[in-house]
Amino acid sequence: MAAITASMVAELRAKTDAPMMECKKALTEADGDMARAEELLRVKLGNKASKAASRVTAEGVVASFIGGNAGSLVELNCETDFVSKNDDFLGFSKKVAELVATQNPADVAALAALPLDGSTVDAVRLALVGKIGENLSIRRFVRFETSNKLAAYLHGTRIGVLVEYTGADEQVGKDVAMHIAAMKPVSLSSDDVPADLIAKERSIAEQKAAESGKPAEIVAKMVEGSVQKYLKEVSLLNQTFVKNDKQTIEQMLKAGNSSVQKFALFVVGEGIEKKQDDFAAEVAAQVAAAKQQ
């Protein structure tokens, strides 16, 4: 049996980016043969990635990049909040955001195939899955390219905003982006609110108004009033500016001779159903998984 030295473990780790203990195990199994150990480790990391692929990723980060006349916003997901703070995962998310802005991929599949760090985005992702031990995924991205101005705002790593705007004052773009993160409008103007959201709100208003026992014509006015109030609350231009409750966003923009063309808002895990695990069952599952390794 060949002696496994610390330098051998370090060399294998540098080649594969795998955890130290995994490198030592692979070298031991390969009887010190570096090439064989590397092959064994890559197979094992690949198996970890395939096992993790079916697990729900409802945590994660939002990253942004602005360069030249293009900007991006991306959401990458992981399984736990702990991994969402992992430096390797955060670094990967920033690289992905830059690629979206500079390379303009058509969709997530095209993004996954782009070159990154001597490999591809998806290969780097899979290597991270093997290293970290959690399923990681690129969920979505948006890219703006414009001759106007761009501003981005990240609230921690869980909420991200990208805004296209005009005007001489760059603070306007920053303020609008921050406002969007705080108030979460669903559209730029009331005319842009999705029809399904309006229908849902109208249905709720009708049920409430019907319970009032008032005449039909009064009920109709109550419903319409509720819908109009909702439209103002969820459309950016009609919202009260968070930094000045005496102004709407539209009034603030006009005062600064500015305008907003469009925006994107990402909230980590929005719309993803999280898996609820029993704690005892989770511990038992982790113990069982450790025994199989």
UniProtKB/Swiss-Prot annotation:
The record, for Gene3D superfamilies, names: 1.10.286.20, DNA helicase RuvA subunit, C-terminal domain, Elongation factor Ts, dimerisation domain
Query: PROSITE patterns under this entry?
Result: EF_TS_2
Does the keyword section mention Protein biosynthesis?
yes
Q: Where in the cell is it found?
A: Cytoplasm
Q: Which GO terms describe its molecular function?
A: translation elongation factor activity
Region Involved in Mg(2+) ion dislocation from EF-Tu: which residues? 80-83
Main localisation: cytoplasm
Q: Which InterPro entries match?
A: EF-Ts_dimer_sf, Transl_elong_EFTs/EF1B, Transl_elong_EFTs/EF1B_dimer, Transl_elong_Ts_CS, UBA-like_sf
**Which of UniProt's keywords are assigned here?**
Cytoplasm, Elongation factor, Protein biosynthesis
Taxonomic superkingdom: Bacteria
Q: Which CDD domains does this UniProt record tie to the protein?
A: UBA_EF-Ts (cd14275)
* Cellular component terms (Gene Ontology): cytoplasm
Recorded hits in HAMAP family, A to Z, give:
EF_Ts
Family in the record: Belongs to the EF-Ts family.
Please give the function described in this protein's UniProt entry.
Associates with the EF-Tu.GDP complex and induces the exchange of GDP to GTP. It remains bound to the aminoacyl-tRNA.EF-Tu.GTP complex up to the GTP hydrolysis stage on the ribosome.
Q: What's this protein's name?
A: Elongation factor Ts
Q: Which organism is it from?
A: Paraburkholderia phytofirmans (strain DSM 17436 / LMG 22146 / PsJN)
